[in-house]
Amino acid sequence: MGVFVFDDEYVSTVAPPKLYKALAKDADEIVPKVIKEAQGVEIIEGNGGPGTIKKLSILEDGKTNYVLHKLDAVDEANFGYNYSLVGGPGLHESLEKVAFETIILAGSDGGSIVKISVKYHTKGDAALSDAVRDETKAKGTGLIKAIEGYVLANPGY
């Protein structure tokens, strides 16, 4: 299995505690509201803590797909949230899993800096294509932007 690591960063105007709550705690309720392709999130295994596996169902090209999302670690005190995409037809066939290590830091003017380390675990000795990496990055960035947009549009959140 090959492992390919990339670090990304996203800057938000939302304060770290509020952005963490939306991304790590309330995403299951927010995602279907802000991403029209998302059909729902359900717990397949676990109690919501580390080790929990969730199924995110998505409508793509007119058919329902899903990806399995495993919660690896939660560090509420430091706004850390680690998870992996571990299966389902929505996970590219060349990938064994994709692990995300996320931490939200205080940014300027009360906003946040979301730092993400992404580890792509490919099957066998397969290389990671730029297309797969770009698609995964675009979906991740889109998810963060959509959830951030929800928080900004709902001041009472």
From Swiss-Prot:
CDD domains: Bet_v1-like. The keyword Zinc does not apply. Induction: By abscisic acid (ABA). InterPro entries: Bet_v_I/MLP, Bet_v_I_allergen, Plant_def-hormone_signal, START-like_dom_sf. Keywords: Pathogenesis-related protein, Plant defense. GO terms for cellular component: cytoplasm; nucleus. One of its GO terms (molecular function) is signaling receptor activity. Coiled coil: none annotated. Transmembrane segments: none annotated. GO terms for biological process: abscisic acid-activated signaling pathway; defense response. This is ABA-responsive protein ABR17. SUPFAM superfamilies: Bet v1-like. It comes from Pisum sativum (Garden pea). Belongs to the BetVI family.
